[in-house]
Curated annotation (Swiss-Prot):
It catalyses: (S)-2,3,4,5-tetrahydrodipicolinate + acetyl-CoA + H2O = L-2-acetamido-6-oxoheptanedioate + CoA. The keyword rRNA-binding does not apply. This is 2,3,4,5-tetrahydropyridine-2,6-dicarboxylate N-acetyltransferase. Keywords: Acyltransferase, Amino-acid biosynthesis, Diaminopimelate biosynthesis, Lysine biosynthesis, Repeat, Transferase. Transmembrane segments: none annotated. PANTHER family: 2,3,4,5-TETRAHYDROPYRIDINE-2,6-DICARBOXYLATE N-ACETYLTRANSFERASE, ACETYLTRANSFERASE. The lineage of its organism: Bacteria, Thermotogati, Thermotogota, Thermotogae, Thermotogales.
Length: 231
C-alpha cells in the first residue's frame, strides 16, 4: 500500500466513535442494534459505535448505564495483536495493517502506525514512535523515545527504511525517506536527515558519520537473543 492509497483509505473510511457501556436492568430479552453484548439478565457490557450503543440503551429496559468513549471519529482500527508471533507489552498501540515479524518485541508505550513493517527479532523500545509505512529490518533495536518518521503527512513517496542489525539509540530521530544501512549504529539523540552507509556509526544534529563499526562498537551494541524468547 503506497502513501496515497493509505491517505485515501483514511479519508474515505467510515469514522467510528468506539465506546463501551456498562448497563443494568431487565436484560433477559435485550434487543441489540449493531452492538456486542456480554453479560447476564441483570448486568452486562455493550461494545460498538456510540450511536448504536445509545440506540440500544434507548430501546431496552435499561435502568442504569455508564458509557466510556475509547476513540472519537476513528478512521482506522487497532490491530488484532493475537495474529502476531511476537512479545507485545501492555500499553503498546499498534494500528491495523502493520506487519510484525516472528520474535519481535514491542515495549510499553510504543506507537506503530498504519503500513509499518517490523522485522523478525527487532525490539521497539518504550515510547518509540514508528510512523506510517516505515520499514525496519531484522534484529534491530530502536531505542526508547526514538521517532522514525512516517510518510502519511506530509506525504512522501519513499518511506524510512532501516536495514537489518541496526542499533538506534534513545531519542534519535530519523526523517522521512532516509535509508539506514545494515549493521549501522545511530547514537542517542541523533537527528538523521540523509542516507547512512552500512556499518557506519553516526552522531550529532544533524547526524554525521563519525567512524565505521568496529569490534568495540559491536560489543557495546549487542542484540540479546534471550530477550526475544517467546517460551
Amino acid at each position: 500500500m503506497n502513501t496515497q492509497e493509505i491517505i485515501n483509505l483514511i479519508a474515505n473510511s467510515k469514522k467510528r466513535t468506539i465506546a463501551k457501556a456498562y448497563v443494568s436492568g431487565n436484560l433477559k430479552n435485550i434487543k441489540l442494534e449493531n452492538v456486542e453484548f456480554v453479560g447476564n439478565e441483570l448486568f452486562g457490557v455493550l461494545f460498538g459505535d456510540l450511536k448504536d450503543i445509545e440506540n440500544t440503551i434507548n430501546k431496552n429496559d435499561i435502568k442504569n448505564y455508564k458509557i466510556e468513549i475509547l476513540a472519537k471519529n476513528s478512521a482506522i482500527p487497532l490491530a488484532d495483536i493475537k495474529k502476531y508471533n511476537a512479545r507485545i507489552e501492555p500499553g503498546a498501540i499498534i494500528r491495523d495493517m502493520v506487519e510484525i515479524g516472528d520474535g519481535a518485541v514491542i515495549m510499553m508505550g510504543a506507537v506503530i502506525n498504519i503500513g509499518a513493517v517490523i522485522g523478525e527479532k527487532t525490539m521497539i523500545d518504550m515510547n518509540t514512535v514508528i510512523g506510517g509505512r516505515a520499514i525496519i529490518g531484522k534484529n534491530c533495536h530502536i531505542g526508547a523515545g526514538s521517532v522514525i518518521a512516517g510518510v502519511i503527512e506530509p506525504p512522501s513517496a519513499k518511506p524510512v527504511m532501516i536495514k537489518d542489525n541496526v542499533m538506534v539509540g534513545a531519542n534519535a530521530v530519523i526523517l522521512e525517506g532516509v535509508e539506514i544501512g545494515e549493521h549501522s549504529v545511530i547514537a542517542a539523540g541523533a537527528v538523521v536527515i540523509e542516507d547512512i552507509p552500512p556499518y557506519s556509526v553516526v552522531a550529532g544534529v544533524p547526524a554525521k558519520v563519525i567512524k565505521k563499526v568496529d569490534k568495540k562498537t559491536e560489543s557495546k551494541t549487542q542484540i540479546i537473543d534471550s530477550l526475544r524468547n517467546l517460551k
